[in-house]
A protein has these predicted regions:
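His/Asp/Glu-rich, glycine-adjacent segments
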Residues: 11-169
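Acidic helix-start/capping segments at beta-turn-to-alpha-helix junctions
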Residues: 1-6, 84
Length: 169
């Protein structure tokens, strides 16, 4: 969050309202995700580790807000691999923030009074094609160099076993 908000607002994280990806709320003692928006839902219908999200905690305007301010009729959408990238770019007035969710395609947040169907309408056809393509042609990672294969290894952190590959398989 602080990186995305800094690049997309031109402001220091101390002034964007997003000083870190997560922090502890001094009033409640609870951990808070930078884009937490408990009143919202996620359009794809499944909760994520981050929970419901939105631009509520972003306290400044972004590139998308500036574009909409200068040209209100313009269509401004933000697409990213992460919610942080999409929401911070889309700001408060952009037309849509979309990010990739495995097994679904592009998703977004839904504010009270909105429907998931309406919020997903701009990307519905893309999502259908994407899911069909991934089912019929699952991505296969190959090693470009044997040096990468040599980096694949097993490792343990706090009694949990992991296996890493380069690129991820």
């Amino acid at each position: 969050c602080p990186g995305h908000s800094t690049v997309l607002t031109g402001m220091h994280p101390a002034t964007t309202g997003l000083p870190a990806n997560d922090w502890v709320d001094a009033k409640t003692g609870q951990e808070v995700y930078c884009l937490a928006a408990p009143q919202n839902t996620l359009a794809h219908g499944r909760n994520t580790d981050n929970g419901p999200v939105g631009p509520d905690q972003l306290e400044v305007t972004t590139l998308a807000d500036w574009l909409k301010d200068q040209s209100p009729q313009s269509r401004v959408f933000a697409v990213s691999g992460k919610d942080r990238g999409a929401i911070n770019l889309n700001g408060h007035t952009g037309d849509g923030a979309y990010w990739f969710t495995g097994g679904f395609g592009l998703t977004t947040y839904v504010e009270p009074g909105q429907t998931a169907q309406d919020r997903l309408a701009p990307v519905a056809a893309f999502n259908t094609r994407l899911v069909e393509t991934l089912k019929s042609q699952p991505p296969a990672w190959t090693y470009a160099f044997e040096d990468c294969r040599a980096l694949a290894s097993d490792w343990t952190i706090r009694d949990a076993a992991f296996h890493s590959t380069v690129p991820p398989a």
